[in-house]
Amino acid sequence: LTTIAEPEAVELATKYILPEDHPYRVIASAGGETFLVYHLDEKGGIQNIHTGNKCASGTGEFFLQQLRRMDISLDEVAAMEIPETPLKVSSRCSVFCKSDCTHALNKGEEKASVIAGLSNMMSDKLIELFQTISMDHVLLVGGCAGNKAMAHFLRQKVRDLHIPDESHCFEALG
């Protein structure tokens, strides 16, 4: 099978699912292993790519590991109400983040608050990648786009956040 590089796949998927005159100049890819932000030019080509640090905290896989530790499924997370005030968790290191979650749960903190804290931290990780890019029109893709709490916290920070139906398979679509 022929393969293409991920940035090229992102360009092709964008052109496939969005109309030519779409306003989106930023694609935030929130995946299981990495978070990336693609800055698009006016023709939909990738102008720049910003990647996060290699720490696992804030990635989809880390989020899933924490859910397993709490014995909560993704379906249960999807049905949860998002607390107004999420637990503050460290975004600097997965060990510190895991420790914050463990201590909070041991002190009786609600699981929903811990999950909201993790989701808010994930949204902050993406925001850090925007650097000097406008956050006016952002397309959110990747498996983590299905995390409604993360999307909720991103919407508080981004003026126009769009999550396409194909977000979970966006790169593969390209």
Task: Show which residues each predicted segment covers.
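Glycine-rich phosphate-binding loop plus the immediately following alpha-helix
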Residues: 45-86, 168-171
